[in-house]
Amino acid sequence: MKIAVLSRNPRLYSTRRLVEAGERRGHQMVVIDTLRAYMNIASHKPQIHYRGRPLEGFDAVIPRIGASVTFYGCAVLRQFEMMGVFPLNESVAISRSRDKLRSLQLLSRKGIGLPVTGFAHSPDDIPDLIAMVGGAPLVIKLLEGTQGIGVVLCETQKAAESVIEAFMGMEQNIMVQEYIQEAGGADIRCFVVGEKVIAAMKRQAKPGEFRSNLHRGGTASLIKITPEERMTAIRAAKVMGLNVAGVDILRSNHGPLVMEVNSSPGLEGIETTTGKDVAGIIIEYLEKNAEHGLTRTRGKG
């Protein structure tokens, strides 16, 4: 197969591994800088141009679209879909998963466990908003934040009010969530490929920190997940319509709670921790499922 990898940087671990895994299995792998692809939208025959030439003959496309280029990246991916190229994850599923609030609304509708979450616009509603999630300590999250940036733990009511007021004053969209103390600064990253959890790791925040992101100095270790956690991760990816997803789960006193569903999960942490050839499993999934013109919009909303 001829497989496109949409990535800003061919030297990134995840991009490199996907290219290696594809080439090892006899496929032609082409890395395309997402922001350098351009399109004639109204042309009768959909096309994408790159460095002065049309992109042709692709069987599948692997989107590795960073959060900051979601809008343009999804437009390029949509154009590939119009050309009948099979996407590892569909554009509509990626844009759905990048909207944190929309994601939680969809997961909630399907009865998937979530931390109690509040959202408001007016500063007048701050006391009610805090009460809604059970009071302090609580977590405040910027809706546009990634990799733990824009996530604040407020240990007192006063601190929570001040931080929420500050964010609202800057006209930033935030959500307020209950703090799951019993998780002890740890979460579980479940790597889902084609309705199976193919690998899982526990991420533990460094001492004095509550965010477990590896980018923030967290450490990763092997973990045995429960059948309920496995089912939760698979269902969450399915609701979002993602074939490949990193589902982040907290262990709480009332079962697994989904924190986030990531449509472009990094491979380095999960491969290094588990020793699994995740890139190879992704290429295998494409071999079994990539059919020309097969873009089914999975998930609803």
From Swiss-Prot:
GO terms under biological process: protein modification process; SOS response; translation
Protein name (database record): Probable alpha-L-glutamate ligase
Family to which the UniProt record says this protein belongs: Belongs to the RimK family.
GO molecular function terms listed in the Swiss-Prot or TrEMBL record: ATP binding; metal ion binding; ribosomal S6-glutamic acid ligase activity
Residues at which Mg(2+) 1 binds: 248, 260
Signal peptide feature range: none
UniProt: Mn(2+) 2 binding residues: 260, 262
Entry's EC annotation: 6.3.2.-
InterPro entries: ATP-grasp, ATP-grasp_RimK-type, ATP_grasp_subdomain_1, RimK, Rimk_N, Rp_bS6_RimK/Lys_biosynth_LsyX
Entry GO terms, CC: cytoplasm
Domain of life: Bacteria
Binding positions for ATP per the UniProt entry: 141, 178-179, 187, 211-213
Domain ATP-grasp: 104-287
Residues reported to bind Mn(2+) 1: 248, 260
Cited PANTHER family: RIBOSOMAL PROTEIN BS6--L-GLUTAMATE LIGASE (PTHR21621:SF7), RIBOSOMAL PROTEIN S6 MODIFICATION PROTEIN (PTHR21621)
Ligand binding (Mg(2+) 2): 260, 262
NCBIfam families linked to this entry: PRK10446.1, rimK_fam
Details of cofactor binding: Binds 2 magnesium or manganese ions per subunit.
Xref: Pfam families: RimK, Rimk_N
